[in-house]
């Protein structure tokens, strides 16, 4: 039995939302309506699973409400979310070498650090993007042993790029999750942490849907630009109203 020694206060309100976006917008609007004469840091939102923070974070960002995560990590700062965004970035722009380096052996494909270093040296010597070398490894004798694995990776990227031209963004993302093997890797591990990470990977689709709802002509490039704005947030300032 739950009880409190505090004096009687406002009754608890129950709101049955139609979706996680509706739920997040309700929370946001409620905070805004109650914020007169208060600081945003006077409010707290409790959620049960990490993935649930995504919709609330997105709603706060659109409404200009400052926030910070206590005892956890911002949705777009989570490694698995960064990994999937890296895939999307490379599919959108093959010249994105930083993201390419992040995903080329993630999940493991037998493409080791030495192979990547050799590919980088070849790219630098030829004055071409790293992806150009990786997608044509048989032209470089030093990459011959890893050529099949490198080709298999670039086939995944190219197939996903073709699907981008044919499918709506949410369906395209479903294919990326499957074809890259990233979601399968997490599901096969089966531990609690991996299941949570898999849930976060799926939750990224909600961000795509939210972006589409607020954009007349949604594109992958546009989505990535919006996410870049979300993630370009300064570290927590203890004196800030968040």
Regions found by a protein language model. Give the residues of each.
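AAA+ P-loop ATPase catalytic core
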Residues: 31, 53, 100-103, 119, ...
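Conserved short internal alpha-helix adjacent to the catalytic or cofactor-binding core
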Residues: 10, 62-68, 73, 77-107
């Amino acid at each position: 039995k739950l009880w409190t020694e505090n004096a009687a206060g406002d009754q608890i309100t129950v709101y049955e939302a139609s979706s996680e976006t509706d739920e997040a917008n309700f929370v946001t609007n409620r905070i805004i309506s109650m914020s007169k004469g208060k600081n945003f840091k006077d409010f707290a939102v409790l959620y049960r699973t990490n993935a649930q923070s995504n919709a609330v974070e997105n709603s706060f960002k659109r409404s200009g409400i400052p926030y910070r995560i206590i005892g956890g990590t911002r949705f777009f700062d989570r490694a698995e979310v960064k990994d999937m965004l890296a895939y999307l970035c490379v599919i959108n722009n093959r010249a994105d070498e930083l993201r390419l380096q992040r995903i080329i052996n993630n999940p493991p494909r037998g493409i080791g650090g030495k192979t990547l270093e050799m590919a980088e040296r070849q790219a630098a010597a030829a004055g071409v993007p790293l992806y150009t070398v990786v997608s044509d490894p048989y032209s470089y004798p030093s990459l011959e042993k890893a050529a099949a694995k490198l080709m298999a990776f670039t086939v995944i990227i190219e197939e996903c790029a073709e699907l981008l031209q044919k499918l709506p963004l949410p369906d395209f993302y479903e294919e990326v999750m499957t074809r890259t093997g990233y979601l399968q890797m997490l599901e096969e591990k089966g531990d609690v942490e991996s299941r949570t990470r898999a849930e976060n990977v799926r939750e990224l689709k909600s961000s795509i849907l939210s972006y589409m709802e607020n954009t007349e002509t949604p594109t992958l490039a546009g989505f990535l630009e919006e996410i870049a704005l979300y993630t370009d947030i300064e570290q927590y300032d203890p004196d800030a109203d968040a």
